[in-house]
A protein has these predicted regions:
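Class I SAM-dependent methyltransferase Rossmann-like catalytic core
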Residues: 2-14
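Conserved alpha-helix/loop element of class I SAM-dependent methyltransferases that forms part
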Residues: 14-33, 48
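Class I SAM-dependent methyltransferase SAM/SAH-binding core
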Residues: 34-88
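Conserved Class I S-adenosyl-L-methionine
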Residues: 42-44, 163-261, 265-270
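A conserved beta-strand element that flanks and buttresses the S-adenosyl-L-methionine
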Residues: 98
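Short catalytic micro-motifs in class I SAM-dependent methyltransferases
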Residues: 101-102
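Helix-to-beta-strand junctions that scaffold the AdoMet/dcAdoMet cofactor pocket
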Residues: 106-107, 120-122
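Conserved catalytic/acceptor-binding region of the Class I
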Residues: 110, 117, 125-193
C-alpha cells in the first residue's frame, strides 16, 4: 500500500504499539543473526529489535518512503529497505521474520505464509499480528458510506472481503508447515480521546487508500459521510473518551531446528560416561 501519512498514523501511536510489543515479547530467540520486520512503518519496533539483539543484522522493510524517512534516524544500527512486502525476498535465510499489522493488506495468505516460512533458517520464527475487526462498525460504516454517494464507482474496486481468515485456518496451515505454532486472539478495549476519534483512527489505515482515490470535493464529502456514521456507532462516554473494541490475531510459527548429528550425540554420551567413572 502507498500513500501512508505518518502523522495521521502516529496520532494513536501507543495503542498501535501495544500489540506489537506483546507479540515481540512472546518471541523466544536468544541470539538471532538475521532479523526482518515486514511493514516496519516508522521503525519503532525495528529499533527495539536492534536494541534487544545487538549482534543481529536487523532490517526494516516497507514500501512507503514517507514512513521510512521517519524510520531511518531512529535506529542507526538497523538497516532499511524500501520494498513491496508482497514480492519481498530476504538476502539471507532469516532467524526471525516479524510483521505487525501489515500482512492483512496482502491477498492469498496460504501462498504468502508458505513463502515466508520458506525464507526461514532451520529453527527460525515467523511472528505475525493482524487485525480481525473487519466486521466491526468502524469498517461496516466504510462500505455503507462508499455505496451512498457518487464516489461509488471509484471506491468499489478498492473494497474487498475480510482479508484475514478464521484462526483455525491459520492453525491448520501453519501446523502443516512448522514444528510448533502458538496462536491466540486478544480484544483490546482502546480508550481514545478527541473529536470522533474512531474516524481519525481509521483514517490512518483502512480509510486512507479510499480517500487517496478521490479528488476534491468528493474526498471531503466521502470522509464526512463516513464520519457521521462512525460517530453514531461509537458515541463518546460521559468523560468525553470513546471506546474502540479491537480484535487482533497473533501467531508465532517456528521451523524445526537442524537435527544434531549422531556423531555429536555419541561423543556427548562418551563424555558423560567418562565423567561419571
Amino acid at each position: 500500500m502507498t500513500g501512508w501519512d505518518p502523522a495521521q498514523y502516529l496520532k494513536f501511536a501507543q495503542p498501535r504499539l501495544r500489540p506489537a510489543l506483546e507479540l515481540l515479547a512472546r518471541v523466544q530467540l536468544d541470539a538471532p543473526a538475521v532479523v526482518y520486520e515486514l511493514g516496519c512503518g516508522t521503525g519503532a519496533l525495528t529499533t527495539i529489535m536492534a536494541e534487544r539483539w545487538p549482534g543481529a543484522v536487523v532490517t526494516g522493510v516497507d514500501d512507503s518512503s514517507d514512513m521510512l524517512q521517519r524510520a531511518v534516524p531512529s535506529a542507526p544500527n538497523a538497516r532499511w529497505q524500501r520494498k513491496d512486502i508482497a514480492t519481498w525476498a530476504p538476502e539471507a535465510a532469516a532467524d526471525l521474520i516479524y510483521s505487525n499489522a501489515a500482512l492483512h493488506w496482502l491477498p492469498d495468505h496460504g501462498q504468502l505464509l508458505r513463502r515466508l516460512i520458506g525464507y526461514l533458517a532451520p529453527g527460525g520464527v515467523l511472528a505475525v499480528q493482524m487485525p480481525r475487526n473487519f466486521s466491526a462498525p468502524s469498517h461496516v460504516a466504510i462500505a455503507e458510506a462508499a455505496r451512498d454517494g457518487p464516489w461509488w464507482a471509484r471506491i468499489e474496486p478498492l473494497l474487498h472481503e475480510s482479508p484475514v481468515a478464521e484462526p483455525r485456518w491459520y492453525l491448520d496451515l501453519l501446523s502443516s508447515l512448522c514444528a510448533s505454532v502458538d496462536l491466540w486472539q486478544t480484544e483490546y478495549f482502546q480508550i481514545l480521546s478527541g473529536e470522533n476519534p474512531v474516524k481519525e483512527w481509521t483514517k490512518g489505515t483502512w480509510l486512507q487508500p479510499l480517500l487517496a482515490a478521490l479528488a476534491e470535493p468528493a474526498r471531503t464529502e466521502f470522509e464526512e459521510a463516513y464520519a457521521r456514521r462512525v460517530a453514531r456507532a461509537y458515541p463518546p462516554r460521559a468523560d468525553g473518551t470513546t471506546v474502540l473494541p479491537f480484535l487482533r490475531l497473533f501467531f508465532i510459527a517456528s521451523r524445526a531446528p537442524l537435527p544434531v548429528p549422531a556423531t555429536t550425540l555419541r561423543r556427548a554420551g562418551r563424555a558423560g560416561r567418562a565423567g561419571g567413572a
